[in-house]
Curated annotation (Swiss-Prot):
UniProt name for this protein: Alcohol dehydrogenase
Pfam families recorded: ADH_N, ADH_zinc_N
Family annotation (PROSITE patterns): ADH_ZINC
Description of how the protein assembles with itself and partners: Homotetramer.
Triggers of expression: By limited oxygen supply.
Record keywords, A-Z: Metal-binding, NAD, Oxidoreductase, Zinc
Organism, scientific name: Cupriavidus necator (strain ATCC 17699 / DSM 428 / KCTC 22496 / NCIMB 10442 / H16 / Stanier 337)
GO molecular function: (R,R)-butanediol dehydrogenase activity; alcohol dehydrogenase (NAD+) activity; aldehyde dehydrogenase (NAD+) activity; zinc ion binding
Family: Belongs to the zinc-containing alcohol dehydrogenase family.
Amino acid sequence: MTAMMKAAVFVEPGRIELADKPIPDIGPNDALVRITTTTICGTDVHILKGEYPVAKGLTVGHEPVGIIEKLGSAVTGYREGQRVIAGAICPNFNSYAAQDGVASQDGSYLMASGQCGCHGYKATAGWRFGNMIDGTQAEYVLVPDAQANLTPIPDGLTDEQVLMCPDIMSTGFKGAENANIRIGDTVAVFAQGPIGLCATAGARLCGATTIIAIDGNDHRLEIARKMGADVVLNFRNCDVVDEVMKLTGGRGVDASIEALGTQATFEQSLRVLKPGGTLSSLGVYSSDLTIPLSAFAAGLGDHKINTALCPGGKERMRRLINVIESGRVDLGALVTHQYRLDDIVAAYDLFANQRDGVLKIAIKPH
């Protein structure tokens, strides 16, 4: 008799539901992980709304914290019963992209029957959980290429302390790294959702001494101060570009980090840059972007625009866990709610509609 599990599956645009599915069978290079905590991401909401196409019946979610239930015959150095995380991006490190230093793009492109952009192709990169294979909002998940992607959780750290590592922390910190921040820099971070808050914390770790956090939610701006912001601006109460330019004496910021994914925030991120400044783009854009020439000076202002997808792999996860374990960053304030997997539909409703001050929801299968 086939062993079954509960999983949150994509049914159709606007509908994710809890269903019974077989517990995955693993191959020699895989691991079966029993999920103890996972969460819902903004990208999952894009899937729910039909803005990003996935197969019907696919288990969604890509942020796993759990316990190794079973190891493939070729996986060494781990043990059953060990607490682990895996990155949202699970590269196998065999592709040209990975060997060329961009492991998050491992996997390149797969045809999607014209359902999305990229000239009829679906950009998958190394994002497999909840995209190309069943994801983590379930009782169990198959972790592919486990040798390259499983990272042990140190004793003394809770699930909630490491829950941001697989995606939100990795993405936000990459935004700070890609901003080319130098010691003493001034940085503007546009949007203080979970990724933007992590970018704010990352900018502080990278050496920025003046961090300007921008959002339209005062509660999130309060949390941004805890993450390291020196100045907070509510865009509902001011002209953000004018305020940033005043704060910098008309010079502009050394770097800006765009963490929302809208035309407006992208433009503002450009307009506040000093000549030669760097825009680090993290937002998930749902439509084409227009780059306004008026946001540039001659020679396009010598500006640099860097983009990034969430880095994955066990070494990246190990480094992020080191930061958490050191106490230099505490992301506990980002976990605002907890739901059982049985109540995943209600959790999606809360998260998608951004009620009750929600930032991240810890989803517990048991």
